[in-house]
């Protein structure tokens, strides 16, 4: 099967919100789709101008990949595991801070502090996505302690999960396809099948892995349940 190449644009938050709104208003015929990340779900809670409901205004079609995060610390911090880091933070409440470069990193740090029962200062700018953090870990500028996904990452099988120490911790960034609300089931099913066929190709899997993303293949129903759980 030959697929026509399409150009995808990475856009600022404001433009992403505008495009989500445009897709929500489009005809549910399968010709206008939104490719987005997990920020799509949280944006309405962060930006008053979002004006869309990620559940009611869209039809989930396919979840295509997960982007795991790592818990990383400065090499000088005397901790080599999540448990040791928690012990340090409990011993000296308020001493340790965590930085973030995205909404997912903010949520990761806040969830860690809540579940572990420790006091951490948030410094907006610890949790970082794999492709951004891995070069620094390999250069020994950062120390990686764990991945944030509930299951071990296929990209970093040597790293333990946060959940192994902090039960209930499961955070990942993801990407997927959505259409307007009320799309016909047969159209959703066909689009899902076409997308999955591409995602499951070995060459596409390899390209996603190079970007630090784990390919994901599932049904529209599974994606719908996943989005509602977010």
Task: Describe the function of each predicted region.
Residues 11-19, 67, 80, 103-104, ...:
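Short helix-initiation/N-cap motifs at beta->coil->alpha
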Residues 39-49, 106, 110-115, 127-158:
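A ligand-binding cleft/hinge motif common to bilobed small-molecule-binding domains
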Residues 1, 17-22, 45:
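Active-site pre-lysine segment of PLP-dependent enzymes
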Residues 133, 152, 162, 204-205, ...:
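A generic structural signal for short hydrophobic patches within well-formed alpha-helices
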Residues 6-14, 59-60, 98-100, 120-128, ...:
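Short beta-strand-to-loop elements that line the ligand-binding cleft
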Residues 219-230:
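Extracellular/periplasmic bilobal clamshell ligand-binding domains
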């Amino acid at each position: 099967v030959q697929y026509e190449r399409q150009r995808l644009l990475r856009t600022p938050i404001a433009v992403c919100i505008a495009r989500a709104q445009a897709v929500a208003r489009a005809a549910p015929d399968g010709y206008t789709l939104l490719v987005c990340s997990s920020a799509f779900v949280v944006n309405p809670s962060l930006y008053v101008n979002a004006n869309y409901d990620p559940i009611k205004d869209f039809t989930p079609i396919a979840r295509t990949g997960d982007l795991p995060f790592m818990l990383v610390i400065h090499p000088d911090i005397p901790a080599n595991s999540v448990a040791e880091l928690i012990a340090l933070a409990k011993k000296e409440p308020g001493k340790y801070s965590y930085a973030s470069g995205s909404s997912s990193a903010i949520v990761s740090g806040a969830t860690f502090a809540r579940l572990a029962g420790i006091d951490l200062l948030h410094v907006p700018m610890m949790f970082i996505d794999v492709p951004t953090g891995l070069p620094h870990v390999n250069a020994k500028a950062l120390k990686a302690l764990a991945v944030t996904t509930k299951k071990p990452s296929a990209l970093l099988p040597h790293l333990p999960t946060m959940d192994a120490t902090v039960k209930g911790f499961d955070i990942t960034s993801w990407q997927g396809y959505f259409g307007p609300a009320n799309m016909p089931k047969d159209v959703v099913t066909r689009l899902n099948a076409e997308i999955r066929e591409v995602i499951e190709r070995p060459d596409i899997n390899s390209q996603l892995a190079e970007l630090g993303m784990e390919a994901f293949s599932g049904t529209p129903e599974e994606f719908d349940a996943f989005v509602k759980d977010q």
